[in-house]
Amino acid sequence: IKNCLTVFQHDPLLSGAIAYNLLTDRTDIVKPLGYDRSPSASMTDTDMKYIRLYLEENYDLTSEKKIIDAADLAAHQNSYHPVRDYLNSLTWDGTERIRYCLHHFLGAEADEYTFQVLRLFLLGAIHRAFHPGCKFEVMLCLVGGQGAGKSTFFRLLAGKDEWFSDDLRKLDDENVYRKLQGHWIIEMSEMIATANAKSIEEIKSFLSRQKEVYKIPYETHPADRLRQCVFGGTSNAMDFLPLDRSGNRRFLPVQVCPEQAEV
């Protein structure tokens, strides 16, 4: 493995070419490797075959397992987090935006509650990106008629489409981590729309989790996958929450009114 790792670290073509994506839990190709490949950053089996061919032709290294193990080590030594990099690249121009954001885009009331709810949600999203697994168990719920732009708002808030998902359908699926993997903001729409007392309790329990224990198919041992995402809800009805004597503090509803939006 040592010889293969040395090649990944110092070869002009391979050095810095693969990196471990801390958001997706996958290895990415982050610079050209001398052959045509798909636009996706994630390493594929075809990528690994080209890399093995390169090591065989140039260094007479042929052990598939050792090359794969060395590539994994090299990637982890060159890890990165795309959401953190994105957030660190932003420069504030001094203009306050959070206070009137939901009013501007969705026509929500421009009051203190709306401001504090969105501020809390954004702080939770940022904290989860920089400190995976931190405690954050509330959900911003946008309530309004169909076509009001609720889902679009969450998608745009994520920054990139691949950091957003609305594909979370079941909470008791053993593969639920795969639905969270690689996403920063996740919308729960169908579950909120059909919520009853039992399902609300399930959602509250799900929101309180700080990690999933999951074994990625190629791994030997299961690992704690600390949460890096936050959850938003959308509903067409303001009374989407059933009566709960223990309180529904985890759900922060905001009524939207697109007719009053400024865009």
Residue map of PLM features:
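Conserved RecA-like P-loop NTPase ATPase core
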Residues: 151, 189, 203, 232, ...
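P-loop NTPase catalytic core of nucleic-acid-dependent motor ATPases
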Residues: 71-181, 185
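Conserved catalytic/switch belt of AAA+ P-loop NTPases
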Residues: 200-223
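A short helix-turn-beta junction within AAA+ P-loop NTPase domains corresponding to the substrate/partner-engaging
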Residues: 241-261
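N-terminal nucleic-acid engagement/recognition segments and initiation subdomains in replication
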Residues: 1-100, 112-116
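AAA+/SF3 P-loop NTPase mechanochemical coupling elements
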Residues: 175-182, 216-234
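Short glycine-/polar-rich loops that comprise or flank the Walker A/P-loop
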Residues: 182-184, 209-210, 227-230, 246-252
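Conserved AAA+/SF3 P-loop NTPase catalytic/coupling segment centered on the Walker-B
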Residues: 184-207, 241-247
